[in-house]
Amino acid sequence: MFIRLLTVIVPQKPVSIDPSAGVSYIAERETAVYTEPSPTPEPTELTAAPAETGFLEIKDNNFNAAFKDIHICGDSLMEAIYEYGILDGKYITAAVGVNSNHIDKNYNDLVALKPKYLVLHYGSNTIGSKDAADSFISDYKASILRLKEQLPDTEIYVDSIFPVSQNAASKQKKFNNIPYYNEKLAEMCSEIGVHFLDYTILFNDFETNYYDKDGIHPLRKFYEEQYLPFVYTEIMRGR
């Protein structure tokens, strides 16, 4: 059972990227990149995906066409989608090592963009003790409410914090608090009237199939096979 959440934009500049490089490349980047908008692609046809996934099919795996009305905003986990070459930079606003104040830093650009759907992904760089969760939620909520005031017609989705591998959690105990933080995120979304996207169910095989060597950052195929199809399905079915 999927739960809704959400979003971002990244300016794009000429850069030679090896899509297989993964986290090692992303870690070298300190800021996101933005590109001038290109002509709007033709709308994608909504068709059923194979029964084993339950996702709507993204026609011809054309993620740019599928996400033409969706903007994703977040940290390095979202920047990876651009760095891997899955989505163009104009659909993403992301940077390495940021937290929810990244929304405020890009506030004017996001408001000017006026996306139909906005997906927000923050928390991996902020997560700490359970006692620190309230401060994280308070800051995040304030940033979202500020956006809602200027973007009343934008549907906002908030991502859950991605789980990490058992090995990564054993090295950094704070990651054991991810479920608690996600509970707080779900409560926040319900309180302020935005969608919550809970990806926990997608990580059943994440340990062996989807992690980079650090056990924290997903590989390219996670975004192509799981994350983006799930986001697309949740948004299309909920519109």
Q: What is each of the regions a protein language model found here?
A:
Residues 1-28, 80, 113, 125-126, ...:
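Extracellular glycan-modifying ectodomains
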Residues 133-143, 174-182:
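Charged helix-capping and loop-helix junction motifs
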Residues 1-67, 83, 238-239:
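N-terminal secretory targeting modules
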Residues 95-97, 125-134, 147, 170-175, ...:
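Second-shell loop/turn segments in exported
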